[in-house]
């Protein structure tokens, strides 16, 4: 793991580490809420990134060439995978599109939460280009993959109530078995 001082700015370091906080936050939300919709959302986000990785292996477009060492936004570490589409952008597109209509979650400030979601998403998408990990096109295509995945995944959820029933039954069964082992 890189230190903040390895980056051109602390902001870029924070944005480069969003995958850790987003993954941890999603896992905590699943464990905390124990709700089928939360698990469905996480499975869709994971599925969208798997789709991006498959597309990436099919297209095989390289990442942008490394910047010169004198460039302020020189990448911290070279990425060894292909760049099209950006998997981070796919996940961000999915999260943004799926979460937007669900906000507010816990407060009455719908526009405050939506503004925070938009700013964090926008800054993180920008950072993928600024750090030299992706081209603008790779980020845009990744975002489009995520947006379309979220729309399809949400449509599946809305059109089939059996999904919620089956997932909630699974969650409750697993929880009960885990709790009974420690009781």
Identify the meaning behind each predicted range.
Residues 1-30, 36-44, 49-82, 173-183:
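N-terminal transmembrane-helix/juxtamembrane module of multi-pass inner/ER membrane proteins
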Residues 29-34, 100-104:
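Structural signal for the C-terminal ends of transmembrane alpha-helices
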Residues 68-183:
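Membrane-embedded catalytic cores of phosphoryl/pyrophosphoryl-handling enzymes
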